[in-house]
Amino acid sequence: MSQVEISELAKEIRASLKQFPNFPSEGILFEDFLPVFTKPDLFQKLVRAFQLHVGEQKVDYVVGLESRGFLFGPTLALALGAGFVPVRKAGKLPGPVFTAEFQKEYGSDKFQIQKDVIEEGAKVLIVDDILATGGSASSAGELVKQTGGDIVEYLFVMELDFLNGRDKLDKPAFTLLSGQAEKLQN
């Protein structure tokens, strides 16, 4: 892995982000990474940075969390020669599913994964846009374990460090862009 190349790619990607103070609620600095997808070269750089990080590590599946993990998860899976598996909100997937509940800031939610899509012992990456409290990522990890998959690592574009979400994860986590160390000060 070329850490220097990953750092250079991260700088270019960070420069394209838009910031929105106090969105979606007071005290939050929302960093919108959607502009990355309006420029094909930046989108390719995002995928390339994650691909460089993963390196030669064998990956069978990339699991993307609804909904922003769906934006780059399939493209990363393709670049890695892996399959893509979605984790969705409850009631959105057909057939037999595993379900895991997780806590959000204002209540709880449920994620699901189809039961027959990941083979026992398959190597899995879990991807999402932001690591915040760690609840949704941890829930996705629980689902992968229920399928018999082996989590290799969690990958995120950004992290809200002050929420300590990585403490809820039982496997290594990589964040491409340096995170927010503290809550927005007004």
Curated annotation (Swiss-Prot):
BP GO terms, sorted: adenine salvage; AMP salvage; purine ribonucleoside salvage
UniProt enzyme class: transferase
Entry EC number(s): 2.4.2.7
Residues at which AMP binds: A132, T133, G134, G135, S136
GO CC annotations on file: cytoplasm; nucleus
Catalytic activity annotation: AMP + diphosphate = 5-phospho-alpha-D-ribose 1-diphosphate + adenine
Pfam families: Pribosyltran
InterPro entries (alphabetical): Ade_phspho_trans, PRibTrfase_dom, PRTase-like, UPRTase/APRTase
Coiled coil: none
Molecular-function GO terms, alphabetical: adenine binding; adenine phosphoribosyltransferase activity; AMP binding; metal ion binding
Top-level division of the source organism's lineage: Eukaryota
Places the protein is found: Cytoplasm; Nucleus
Annotated metabolic or biological route of this protein: Purine metabolism; AMP biosynthesis via salvage pathway; AMP from adenine: step 1/1
Record keywords: Cytoplasm, Glycosyltransferase, Magnesium, Metal-binding, Nucleus, Purine salvage, Transferase
Cofactor(s) listed: Mg(2+)
Main localization, broad class: cytoplasm
Quaternary context: Homodimer.
Task performed by this protein: Catalyzes a salvage reaction resulting in the formation of AMP, that is energically less costly than de novo synthesis.
Family from the record: Belongs to the purine/pyrimidine phosphoribosyltransferase family.
Protein name: Adenine phosphoribosyltransferase
Source species: Debaryomyces hansenii (strain ATCC 36239 / CBS 767 / BCRC 21394 / JCM 1990 / NBRC 0083 / IGC 2968)
Lineage: Eukaryota, Fungi, Dikarya, Ascomycota, Saccharomycotina
Underlying gene: APT1
